């Protein structure tokens, strides 16, 4: 009787497993114009993870509100180790939702998509043969917990929305470069863990009105490795638009950022320059194909959700069909960037080049002013149109830099080094005190933003001068060698004149302050004595007086001139000296040890 009993038990387990799967009933409410609350979202993913062996829900770190950042993974062969998945030649997609919880369609759409995938609706499960899916259910948890019917008041559903900013009143889609929030650091940990080939962030836009429910921001192809960029522009993007047109009732158009900012779409739209503080700008630094869906705020919420479900399906289908080439191009880019010498820090739109784009819009009506009041224009839905418009897609480099062999960072700035470590950057430390000949930057000029941005008065239009000099370094100071697949991130964060560098975000601002200086009354006689003894200095002083009349009559300017040309000025050597130095080539007898300190244990 032993074997029949075992067989019966096995059959019972199979039946129970099948029944268990059949019992999954996710209560999505988007057809009722409602988005799930945070606890309902996590409960939905917990149900899916409990019922399907191909799914797993894990915590990846803390967020500013104290709640964990979750990652939901779907793997067809139940292998949830991304390294192992990649070793099998599979592709990985990461989907981020709820960065702005007032734009929630991606939250509900991702649950619907995951459920459809796991229960093999429309034969979707085949995509899991070579694609692993990672989903961040809600990124801005603090904003999601603060719900109101008055957030996003001009939005056509859902009835209740979350708050745009997080628990620290920061916009998380401006924090990916500087990573001040626990959310951003937990995202970096998640991104490093998965090392995705494709990334998607879901949003809603409240810009112009037109006939499309869903629009798409794609990272600039020119920012990618040339091989990846060519594939992205010539195959991936056109095919995604084509697939949405063919397989979705909604269709899709590039994100509408108007070229004239006056409301006339017919004058053309421009490709979005996604700087590294945005999610897609950040992820593309690591050779990842990056997208941001932007649903139109005026379209009904259920339609917005369904359009995102459709895009998730088509993005996964494309990745499934082209996984081999996607993987090959990314792997090649990861290797090539280690040897790449020149990096672009800033870009400028080229308005002399445009492509033709078929666009479906509405006539824009601008009423005449009434009784001295300016009447706001509107889009007349009774007057639809379809026409070809210019689409400006070309950005040219306007600021480039040649990477050094390594960057040297004094240990006094360890908080900046921690930011590098959060992003998987390999760091070394000096084994002994030493003097090193390095290339240094002096900050000659910088402009401050007039208003706070993310709690910062950002440094803009930074001008630097270069001085080669020997600097003292000490045991424990940091060295970051630029032979890494994350070189693009390293360079853009550590070059002070890069628009999104750590310097731009004020992490080195103390160097802009001067503290050592002379007292006018007690120091004048000492300087005059120096002038009498130094014939060359006296001659330079007289020449300056002849050349500059204002200088000749300004005693304070003359004292400053003497001070700056005296040995005493050596104390000012560190004034406005950017502390991160460039080591152009590897020195002889350069003793380093790997820094094994981790940063995630403290989170």
Please provide the spans of the model-predicted regions.
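Alpha-helical transmembrane segments
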Residues: 4-8
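Structured catalytic-domain cores with a bias toward divalent-metal coordination
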Residues: 3, 18-603
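Hydrophobic h-region of N-terminal signal peptides that target proteins for export
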Residues: 10-17
């Amino acid at each position: 009787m032993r074997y029949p009993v075992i067989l019966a038990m096995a059959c019972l387990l199979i039946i129970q497993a099948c029944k268990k799967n059949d019992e999954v009933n996710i209560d999505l409410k988007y057809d009722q114009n409602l988005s799930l609350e945070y606890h309902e979202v996590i409960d939905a993913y917990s149900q899916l993870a409990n019922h399907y062996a191909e799914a797993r829900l894990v915590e990846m770190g803390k967020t500013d509100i104290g709640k964990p950042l979750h990652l939901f993974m779907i793997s067809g062969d139940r292998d949830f180790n991304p390294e192992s998945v990649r070793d099998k030649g599979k592709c990985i997609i990461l989907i981020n939702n709820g960065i702005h919880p007032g734009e929630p369609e991606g939250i509900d759409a991702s649950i619907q998509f995951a459920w459809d995938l796991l229960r093999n609706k429309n034969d979707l499960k085949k995509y899991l043969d070579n694609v692993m899916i990672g989903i961040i259910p809600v990124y801005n948890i603090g904003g999601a917990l603060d719900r109101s019917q008055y957030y996003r008041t001009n939005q056509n559903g859902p009835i209740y929305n979350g708050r745009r900013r997080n628990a620290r009143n920061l916009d998380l889609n401006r924090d990916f470069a500087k990573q001040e929030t626990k959310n951003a650091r937990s995202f970096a940990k998640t991104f490093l863990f998965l090392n995705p080939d494709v990334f998607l962030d879901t949003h809603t836009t409240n810009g112009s009105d037109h006939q499309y429910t869903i629009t798409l921001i794609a990272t600039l192809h020119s920012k990618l490795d040339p091989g990846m960029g060519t594939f992205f522009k010539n195959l991936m993007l056109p095919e995604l638009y084509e697939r949405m047109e063919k397989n979705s009732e909604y269709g899709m158009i590039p994100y509408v950022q108007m070229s004239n900012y006056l409301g006339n779409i017919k004058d053309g739209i421009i490709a979005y320059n996604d700087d590294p503080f945005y999610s897609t700008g950040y992820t593309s630094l690591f050779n990842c194909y990056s997208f941001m869906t932007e649903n139109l705020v005026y379209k009904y919420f259920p339609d917005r959700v369904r359009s995102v479900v459709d895009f998730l399906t088509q993005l996964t289908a494309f990745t499934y069909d082209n996984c081999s080439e996607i993987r090959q191009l990314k792997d090649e880019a990861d290797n090539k960037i280690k040897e790449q010498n020149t990096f672009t820090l800033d870009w400028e739109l080229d308005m002399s080049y445009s492509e033709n784009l078929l666009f479906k819009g509405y006539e824009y009506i601008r009423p005449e002013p009434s009784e001295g009041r300016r009447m706001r224009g509107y889009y007349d839905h009774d007057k639809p149109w379809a026409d070809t418009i210019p689409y400006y897609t070309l950005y040219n480099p306007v600021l480039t830099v040649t990477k050094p062999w390594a960057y040297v960072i004094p240990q006094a700035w360890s908080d900046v080094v921690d930011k590098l470590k959060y992003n998987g950057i390999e760091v070394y430390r000096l084994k002994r005190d030493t003097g090193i000949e390095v290339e240094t930057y002096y900050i000659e000029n910088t402009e401050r933003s007039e208003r706070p941005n993310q709690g910062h008065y950002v440094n803009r239009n930074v001008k630097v001068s270069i001085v080669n000099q020997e600097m003292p370094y000490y045991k424990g100071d940091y060295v970051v060698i630029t032979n890494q697949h994350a070189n693009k991130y390293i360079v853009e964060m550590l070059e002070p004149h890069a628009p999104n560098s750590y310097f731009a975000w004020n992490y080195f601002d103390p160097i802009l302050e001067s503290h050592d200086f002379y007292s006018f009354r007690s120091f004048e006689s000492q300087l005059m004595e120096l002038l009498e003894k130094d014939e060359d200095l006296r001659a330079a002083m007289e020449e300056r007086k002849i050349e500059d009349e204002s200088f000749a009559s300004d005693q304070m300017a003359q004292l400053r001139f003497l001070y700056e040309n005296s040995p005493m000025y050596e104390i000012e050597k560190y004034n406005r000296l950017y502390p991160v130095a460039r080591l152009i080539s590897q020195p002889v007898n350069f003793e380093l040890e790997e820094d094994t300190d981790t940063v995630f244990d403290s989170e």
